[in-house]
């Protein structure tokens, strides 16, 4: 059974921790399996070809291969995340969250978001919701982005001559509406574009 279908079936149980593991995935440096507990303060890393779907509190995540994520927060909420490297699709419940990457700080308020973190550039697609973007190396370079359906992806760079050059428009890449629907289902929600008349897309 395909990953998206398996995970969607699990949604009725409101799972927590690791829901699906493909290939080599580590929690705090140790091999992870589906069903493993995951809490704020843990780290998740994937090897080439590895990926994982997991739930922490009201938030759900899909981490792709060659990625490393550090979490922090209370026992029920991962309030602060650091994507050291790699690719992460996330959906968040209400409340403030923060994600840091090598080049950006992203303030989140009830959002679906896709991030690709590299040493010199971060890609951010606010799939829906509201985020505050800030360049790490130039705090005055900032932008608030509000979208309903992948409307305003951005690159945030490590270096730039002016604030306007630190955050620039980007295309929509490497994530799908089906993945967002699957993640939201795990925490008992639907993306706002479901039922809105907007077509589902794969980018």
Annotate each language-model stretch with its function.
Residues 2-43, 47-51, 55-203:
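Flexible, surface-exposed loop/linker segments and immediately adjacent secondary-structure boundaries
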């Amino acid at each position: 059974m395909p990953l998206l279908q398996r995970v969607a079936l699990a949604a009725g149980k409101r799972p927590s921790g690791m829901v699906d593991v493909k290939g080599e995935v580590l929690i705090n440096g140790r091999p992870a399996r589906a069903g493993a507990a995951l809490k704020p303060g843990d780290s998740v890393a994937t090897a080439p070809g590895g990926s994982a779907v997991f739930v922490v509190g009201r938030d759900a995540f899909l981490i792709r291969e060659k990625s490393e994520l550090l979490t922090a927060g209370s026992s029920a909420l991962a309030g602060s995340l650091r994507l050291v490297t790699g690719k992460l699709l996330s959906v968040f419940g209400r409340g403030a969250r923060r994600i840091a990457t090598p080049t950006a700080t992203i303030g989140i308020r009830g959002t679906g978001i896709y991030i690709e973190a590299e040493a010199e550039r971060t890609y951010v697609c606010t799939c829906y919701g509201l985020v505050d973007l800030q360049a790490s190396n130039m705090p005055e370079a900032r932008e608030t982005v509000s979208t309903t359906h992948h409307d305003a992806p951005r690159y945030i760079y490590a270096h730039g001559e002016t604030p306007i050059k630190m955050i620039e428009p980007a295309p929509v890449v490497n994530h799908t509406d089906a993945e967002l629907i699957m993640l939201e289902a795990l925490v008992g929600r639907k993306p706002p574009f479901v039922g809105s008349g907007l077509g589902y897309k794969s980018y």
